[in-house]
Amino acid sequence: MVKKRKNNGRNKKGRGHVKPIRCSNCSRCTPKDKAIKRFTIRNMVESAAIRDISDASVFAEYTVPKMYLKLQYCVSCAIHGKIVRVRSREGRRNRAPPPRVRYNKDGKKVTPTQGAKTA
């Protein structure tokens, strides 16, 4: 039988069993090593209200607290939510992370190689 992935879609080497976690989106039980994990940092207040809060605040330099979330998705929710994409057979062999899209102050896309040239 043909193997689709070298690691069988999980990060379990030499362990017999891994404790399941619950998907952040649908609460499905998924092995911890198979789940797609993303760590996000967000402001607790939306960006439109930050200026209003800072104007109304008594303190001069008040920083709005941030939310630190570890999101863990099952494979189907990660694909549906476009956190990961289905890749071709050759694409599955590529272990490098996808290139990150960066924006400059004007809101235009900048590739890391362009940023190094201009600096």
Curated annotation (Swiss-Prot):
Where located? Cytoplasm
Major location category of this protein: cytoplasm
Keywords of the record:
Cytoplasm, Ribonucleoprotein, Ribosomal protein
Renumbered to this chain, region (Disordered) spans: 1-20, 88-119
What Gene Ontology terms describe what this protein does at the molecular function level?
A: mRNA binding; structural constituent of ribosome
Q: Name one GO cellular component term.
A: cytosolic small ribosomal subunit
Q: Which InterPro entries match?
A: Ribosomal_eS26, Ribosomal_eS26_CS, Ribosomal_eS26_sf
State one Pfam family annotation.
Ribosomal_S26e
Q: Which GO terms describe its biological process?
A: translation
User: The organism sits in which domain of life?
Assistant: Eukaryota
Quaternary assembly: Component of the small ribosomal subunit (SSU). Mature N.crassa ribosomes consist of a small (40S) and a large (60S) subunit. The 40S small subunit contains 1 molecule of ribosomal RNA (18S rRNA) and at least 32 different proteins. The large 60S subunit contains 3 rRNA molecules (26S, 5.8S and 5S rRNA) and at least 42 different proteins.
User: What does the similarity note say?
Assistant: Belongs to the eukaryotic ribosomal protein eS26 family.
Protein name, UniProt field: Small ribosomal subunit protein eS26
